[in-house]
Amino acid sequence: MMIVKSWQEKNFEPCFALLRQLVEHFPVYYANGNHENRMKYHENSFPGWYKEFVAELKKLNITHLIDESIKLENGIRISAIDLDESYYGKFKNHKATISPEEIREKVTIDDQTEEFHIVLCHKPLNTDGFAKNRIDLVLSGHYHGGMIRLPKIGAVFSPELSVFPKYSGGLYRENNTTLISSRGLGNHTINLRFLNKPEIVFCKLVKEKDNEPIV
């Protein structure tokens, strides 16, 4: 999550107001998106913004993951994939897929374990790359639900201004991999939502065999 008023005036407070409430009740794991990386790689335009933002995450004891994996109790692994700016160009000037090999370069894949693997990837990408790496759950967002949604058609625009994005919001499955794309809370590029309610996704993980909650 990243909230700013504009690229000339930063205002992190709405974001951290929510995060402060979340950390009171849950462990929070944070992955970068396109806004964070824009601050990170364009220091001249946003001097000190990224360092300030990351420092605030640390103050709240939020686990900030960048192309890394951590193993939790109960056989759960959480990983985060950090996508570079080539994935976020406007119109057709952006990558829309990620290969199984690229995924393995960014996160730990253990083919010999039965652990449940959750991957945070800001932009929802092709599910086959994750499925081939036996990743169980991918949590994404970025598309803001397509901003404008039409009956029987679905999402109209992506933030890259391409039309009819595939993974615009909801649940998608390929083999044993599930991808959830949240419609999120804010707007992007076109400051408009039409037939597209903001949302926070709540996931309950349940063991397949004995129907007991994992977390």
Name each model-derived stretch.
Residues M1-I3, P27-N34, L65-D67, I118-C121, ...:
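Active-site neighborhood of phospho(di)ester-bond hydrolases with catalytic His/Asp-centered motifs
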Residues M1-T63:
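Membrane-embedded segments
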Residues I3-K10, N37-K51, S86-A96, K152-F164, ...:
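Acidic/histidine-rich helix-loop elements
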Residues N34, A80-D82, R183, K207:
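A mature extracytoplasmic/lumenal domain signature
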Residues K40-L60, S69, E73-H117, T127-D128, ...:
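Binuclear metal-dependent hydrolase catalytic cores centered on His/Asp/Glu-rich metal-binding motifs
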Residues H64, I78-A80, L179:
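Generic preference for hydrophobic
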Residues D67-E73, G170-N175:
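Short acidic-hydrophobic surface loop/beta-edge motif
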